[in-house]
Amino acid sequence: METLDGFAREKLDALEAQALRRRLVETDRREGAIAFREGRRLVSFCCNDYLNLSQHPDVKRAAVEATGKYGTGSGASRLVSGNHPLFGELERRLADWKQTEDCVVFGSGYMANMGIIPSLVREGDLIIADELSHACLLSGSKLSGARVAIFRHNDIAHLEELLGAHRGGAKHCLILTDGIFSMDGDAAPVEALAALAAQHDAWLMTDDAHGIGVVGHEGRGSSFMGERKAAVPLQMGTLSKAVGGYGGYLCASAPVVDLIRTRARTLIYSTGLPPAAVAASIAALDFIRGNPDYCKRPVEKARSFTRALGLADPVSPIVPLILGDAEVTLAASALLEAEGYLVTGIRPPTVPEGTARLRFTFTAEHDDADIARLATLVRERIIQRRAAE
């Protein structure tokens, strides 16, 4: 008879053999891009706090003041008595910024997608998702009971083919995609997706976790990257990346948001976010709206890095360097850490097999000299050495 501990050890040993075991490493983040690990001062290039707002004095002050006024927790589900006044203020500001009628805030982005998708589609309906969509979009899709089809990454022709083949047999159809893809940093063709969705009577939902605050007109996100706002009826995103706090949201029409508040199990059965988290997001959003030029800095920093390496200009603060092998990727990450740079290696199943990578993320406060030195290290110690092997 196999014991629980024996089962766990066997699985861990198998993961270790493939260089796929995960470990938590205590990381002390400070102002700017500085982090401390095991007493060592490192420059972090693997943080999603793109605008460094988690350390902004106004944002921290708002969190402290909200705690003093409302306490450390909301005390209940939002639908019971946990809907403190700050929720409404944040939701109104998000809806106004994203140019929608209403907004609902969740405990996290993952919880948002796990609640939204099953609230909109179910058995007899169809979901078509980009193959590189975030895990929570795919998990929410499976939970819904709807039929799920996958289209090749950013391949509009393949999506149209799947719509032609399967849309007629489904009552409702939901198209899912990241706005900015978290592991590759590229953007979805949102305007083309919106046009195709309208043509086939489908609903388009974008997960803009890595777009809000850093791409699009005034940092409004991927739906605003074109000359005019794309017709995306379901704009989902997070408050934990460029906003610097915690939580998720959906901006949509008033009837849709009302339905989500009524049906989303991850909202109904979860305690509301603490007042401090909501207040911090309000303050961060105020900063973002008042400083559009500052919001451009993460992408500008990323471009200075790629140009030093002769790579294509990125559209987001995310720059992947695909190395393929998990062990090679871990070794490259360790090499950079020994030189004072924190760049985490990303391995399967987070990314597809054979695409393990270093994922560099850039923030508004990264020092240009650090970026230049990092680029030199990557070029001479990783790229050129691999080319010579």
UniProtKB/Swiss-Prot annotation:
Residues that, per the record, bind substrate: R22, H134, T350
GO molecular function, one term: pyridoxal phosphate binding
Binding annotation for pyridoxal 5'-phosphate: G109, Y110, S182, D207, D208, A209, H210, T238, L239, S240, K241
Top-level taxon: Bacteria
Keyword set, alphabetical order: Biotin biosynthesis, Pyridoxal phosphate, Transferase
Pfam families, per database record: Aminotran_1_2 (PF00155)
Pathway named in the protein's UniProt entry: Cofactor biosynthesis; biotin biosynthesis
Top EC class, one word: transferase
InterPro entries (UniProt xref): Aminotrans_II_pyridoxalP_BS, Aminotransferase_I/II_large, AON_synthase_class-II, AONS_Archaea/Proteobacteria, PyrdxlP-dep_Trfase, PyrdxlP-dep_Trfase_major, PyrdxlP-dep_Trfase_small
EC number: 2.3.1.47
Catalysed conversion reaction: 6-carboxyhexanoyl-[ACP] + L-alanine + H(+) = (8S)-8-amino-7-oxononanoate + holo-[ACP] + CO2
Cofactor(s) recorded in Swiss-Prot or TrEMBL: pyridoxal 5'-phosphate
N6-(pyridoxal phosphate)lysine, modified sites: K241
Keyword field contains Disulfide bond: no
A GO biological-process term: biotin biosynthetic process
Residue runs in coiled coils: none
Purpose: Catalyzes the decarboxylative condensation of pimeloyl-[acyl-carrier protein] and L-alanine to produce 8-amino-7-oxononanoate (AON), [acyl-carrier protein], and carbon dioxide.
Family: Belongs to the class-II pyridoxal-phosphate-dependent aminotransferase family. BioF subfamily.
Subunit note: Homodimer.
Protein name: Putative 8-amino-7-oxononanoate synthase
Gene that encodes it: bioF
